Every structure is written in structure tokens, then in C-alpha cells.
Amino acid sequence: MKSFKTIAGVAGISILLSGCGASNTLKGSLIGAGGGGALGAGVGALIGKATGNAGKGAAIGAAAGVAVGTTAGALIGRKMDKAKAAAAAAMQDATVETTKDGRGLEAVKVTLDNGVLFAAGKSDLQPAAKASLKKFATEVLNIYSDVDVSIQGFASSDGSDALNLTLSQGRANAVKAYLTGTCRVDPTQITSTEGFGENPDFLVYGPDGKEDRAASRRVEIYLYASQEMINAANAGTLQ
């Protein structure tokens, strides 16, 4: 099963609420040995997007990349491998795979049964979705508290653009509220929530070329290495 790259210490897990290769530990070592600056640019891109200052983000990212050496890269890769394995164990009814997120960064995607998540036109989590999220929070987020979380909501093409944009944001907010409320995930761990509505680039289609509306109604959760994790890796204390 293909593993994902650690880009400037960045790694992602995408949960959709609707091959074989090197481990992150090995890739982290290779990254630390030769790709620090490029990896730093990946961190910088995330920082720039979050702050609205691309120039500052690039500068910060470059510095972070230089700072992440062979040992630190391996430690971050190993930690993200553990988080990935924990997600796979917690979500045995889901598919865990490597993919690229919307920014082109390699990520681990955990795909749940879309039918248990949201009903059409609704942003309320269904009972099965709550059970899956609670297990994910307990066995992954609450244990790997040094990862940052980004939540993205999506809608099917049913309804108006404006309605679906609001609906997708509501779905992302519903997931955040459940994770930070019932599941007691630290609110500061969730760095962003965003709705994309029925953006054509993100709709899901079946083999017949028609939209799979149930699959389009989803939330994606990305996990990536926090500055805390990077600092601990550089200090050699990351467990």
C-alpha cells in the first residue's frame, strides 16, 4: 500500500464524510537529507494560506525546511505513519489510501460509507457518523494531539449554489462542533473549517458518468504536522 510523503513535515489524513512504497519514516529521512528547502516551501504555503501573506509564509517555510534534518524528518515520518495506522485501525469500515489533497500535497485519505453521514439538504450528523467520528477522535486525534486539523465541507449539485455553499460550511462546522464538544478534541487543534459548496471540481461521479450525490455530500478532514511536532523532531524528543 502506497505511503504518503512528508512535505516539510506536512502530512494529511482526509476523512470523507459522505500501491506499495516506502514508509514515511524512510521518506522523512530522505527529505531531511536532501530536500529541506523544498519541504519548507510546503510548510510555507500552508502558513501563507492561513495568514493571507504568501511572502511571509514562504520565508517561514524556507527556514523550517532548512531546520528539518535527516533525523527530524525520520521522526516526523514515523509519527505520521503511526497516526495513519491508528486511523486505519479505528476506521475498519473505511478505506485508507494515499492521495493528493486540493493543494497537490500527498495525503492519507480515509473514506467512510457516504450513506451514514448526511442526508440530502442537511448538515446534521447522522448517528452512524457520530459513532465513527467519536472513535476517530478517541483513537487518533486525542492521542496524536500534535497534529493540526483542517476540515473541509462539500455538497452535491442538488439545490442552488448559494444554498450548497452554506450547507457545505454547515457540515464542516457540524463536524468541528462534534469533535470539540462531545469528543473533547482541543479546539486549538482544529486550525480551519471551510465550505466549498457544489464546486464542480469536487463533485463525485460514478462509473456511468453521473454524479454520485451521496458521495458528494461529505466532509474531508486533513491532519498535518504542527509546529510543535516539527520543534520536537528537531530537538530529538518526538515520540
Where do the model's predicted regions map?
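C-terminal motif of bacterial Sec signal peptides marking the signal peptidase cleavage site
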Residues: 15-19
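Periplasmic peptidoglycan-binding/tethering modules of Gram-negative envelope proteins
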Residues: 55, 59, 73-147, 223-239
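A generic secondary-structure signal
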Residues: 49, 136-140, 178, 182
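Bacterial N-terminal signal peptides that target proteins for export
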Residues: 1-8
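Short, low-complexity, glycine-enriched hydrophobic/amphipathic alpha-helices that associate
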Residues: 21-88
